[in-house]
Amino acid sequence: MTINNSNIQTDLPNSENCDLKNETLNIYFNEPIPIIKHCTNKDTPTNINNNNNNNNNNNNNNNINNNNNNNNNNNNNNNNNNNNNNNNNNNNNNNNINNNNNNNNINFSCNHILPQSALNSGICANSNPTIFLDKFKIIDLRPSGSGAKKGHGFPTIAPMEISHLINENEFSKFMKSFNRVFNYFFLLLFNVVFLIAGIIFPIFISRISILWAVVGSVGIFIIGGIFYCCINKYINGKRVGFISII
């Protein structure tokens, strides 16, 4: 599953009706989506605006209205559907889908997301979706099967529970904090190590020459500073002033 998003939100409302009417998810179908929100109002329909260009969709449990203004070539095998199809090959059952030929985006406007059973047999079973999200508040996957337990890792089958998702913003903040601590650690390490080396080295070399002791001490600081700057640049992608190291 591929998720591309710069602003993933995980504060999923815990209401009984899972009211997500004001939430929008832009989804591009390419791989299976193991993401479902289970709600108590199981009879509430899921209305999906599917904006795709010439897609082959195999769907179950949906009422489909396909409104693509291209060609009128239809190969349809439908059961219990309301279908207006143009230029699509569809196998559909009881889905509410509107295909409007707009940039392969699906806008979810619904009271709840399809349960796992509907996911396996419905819109996601054969169309292999990959998700590209602008807003994302649906991350509550329930385990299934006798051996599945809530919160116990990632089973090989899609049903699972993810109670918390570290989004890109949170991860970015974490990495900045980590890098800051990492930098301070290296700063302290190099300051202490090379300071000690700069003091001890002249003691041993002063027997030969005071000049060499001074050169050696300064050289140790310079080498340490260069090494630290290189390490920091590799990690953070930016340079650190040598004066900050000393």
From Swiss-Prot:
Coiled coil: none
Assigned keywords, A-Z: Membrane, Transmembrane, Transmembrane helix
Lineage: superkingdom: Eukaryota
Location within or outside the cell: Membrane
Transmembrane annotation, as ranges: 185-205, 208-228
Cellular component per GO, a single term: membrane
Membrane topology field: Multi-pass membrane protein
Residues of the signal peptide: none
Biased composition (Low complexity): 47-100
Region named Disordered: 46-100
InterPro entries xref list: Golvesin-related_Golgi
Name by which UniProt lists this protein: Putative uncharacterized transmembrane protein DDB_G0292500
